[in-house]
C-alpha cells in the first residue's frame, strides 16, 4: 500500500501549517509519504484509491471536519473519474518536494517545540 499526502508548501494560515507539521513525523514513521506542493495555494481536498474510488470535497479529512463542520463532499465511484484524479495528484507530486524524517529532525529545536505547542490548539484552528 502506498499512501501519498500532498499539502501546500506555503499555507495561507501559518499557525495551521505549524500545527499540521508537528504531526508529520508520526505519519512518516507509519510508512506514508508527505509532499509539499509548490505553486499557488491549493485548498482542494482530494482522495483517490486504486483508480476506482474518488473523494472531492471542502472538508478536511479529519473527524472534526467530517462530523461537526458544515461541508460539502462528494464520493465518486467511477473508474474514469478516479483515474483522472489520480493522474492529477501524481502530476502535483512530480513537482513537489518530499518531507523526510531527517529533514524534520534537522529543524531547530525551538521550531519543533513551537509546532508541538500549536498542535495542542489544533482542534480550535
Predicted regions and their residues:
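PLD/PLD-like phosphodiesterase catalytic module centered on the HKD motif
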Residues: 1-125
Amino acid at each position: 500500500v502506498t499512501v501519498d499526502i500532498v499539502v501546500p508548501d506555503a499555507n495561507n494560515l501559518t499557525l495551521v501549517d505549524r500545527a499540521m507539521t508537528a504531526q508529520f513525523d508520526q505519519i512518516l514513521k507509519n510508512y506514508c509519504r508527505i509532499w509539499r506542493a509548490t505553486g499557488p495555494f491549493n485548498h482542494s481536498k482530494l482522495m483517490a484509491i486504486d483508480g476506482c474510488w474518488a473523494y472531492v470535497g471542502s472538508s478536511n479529512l479529519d473527524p472534526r471536519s467530517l462530523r461537526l463542520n458544515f461541508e460539502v463532499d462528494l464520493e465518486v465511484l467511477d473508474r474514469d473519474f478516479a483515474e483522472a484524479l489520480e493522474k492529477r495528484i501524481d502530476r502535483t507530486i512530480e513537482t513537489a518536494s518530499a518531507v523526510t524524517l531527517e529533514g524534520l529532525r534537522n529543524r531547530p529545536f525551538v521550531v519543533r517545540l513551537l509546532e508541538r505547542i500549536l498542535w495542542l490548539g489544533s482542534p480550535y484552528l
